[in-house]
């Protein structure tokens, strides 16, 4: 089984069409990985599906980096 970090990075890579090796925990979805607002919505939906969880809109708005996504998933497993 992959770690949460590996799974988050895989989802990010697939959704944002970037290489996993180019994704750092500190990477910002918009500034470093080139996501626009639609990409971030789709990314949150993909994370919800991958981890079988629901991320409320007000929480989703706070998730702007890879590490924040990892932290959210860890806290809500």
UniProtKB/Swiss-Prot annotation:
Keywords: Cytoplasm, Fatty acid biosynthesis, Fatty acid metabolism, Lipid biosynthesis, Lipid metabolism, Phosphopantetheine, Phosphoprotein
UniProt main location, coarse: cytoplasm
Family annotation (InterPro entries): ACP (IPR003231), ACP-like_sf (IPR036736), PP-bd_ACP (IPR009081), Ppantetheine_attach_site (IPR006162)
Lineage: superkingdom: Bacteria
Positions in coiled-coil regions: none
PTM comment: 4'-phosphopantetheine is transferred from CoA to a specific serine of apo-ACP by AcpS. This modification is essential for activity because fatty acids are bound in thioester linkage to the sulfhydryl of the prosthetic group.
Gene Ontology CC: cytosol; membrane
Compartments, record wording: Cytoplasm
Domain Carrier: residue ranges: 2-77
Statement: the UniProt record of this protein carries the keyword Lipid metabolism: yes
Pathway assignment: Lipid metabolism; fatty acid biosynthesis
One Pfam family here: PP-binding
Gene Ontology terms: biological process: lipid A biosynthetic process
GO molecular function, one term: acyl binding
TM region(s), chain numbering: none
Modified residues (O-(pantetheine 4'-phosphoryl)serine): 37
Keyword rRNA-binding tagged: no
Record's function text: Carrier of the growing fatty acid chain in fatty acid biosynthesis.
Family: Belongs to the acyl carrier protein (ACP) family.
Protein name according to UniProt: Acyl carrier protein
Organism field: Chromohalobacter salexigens (strain ATCC BAA-138 / DSM 3043 / CIP 106854 / NCIMB 13768 / 1H11)
Gene: acpP
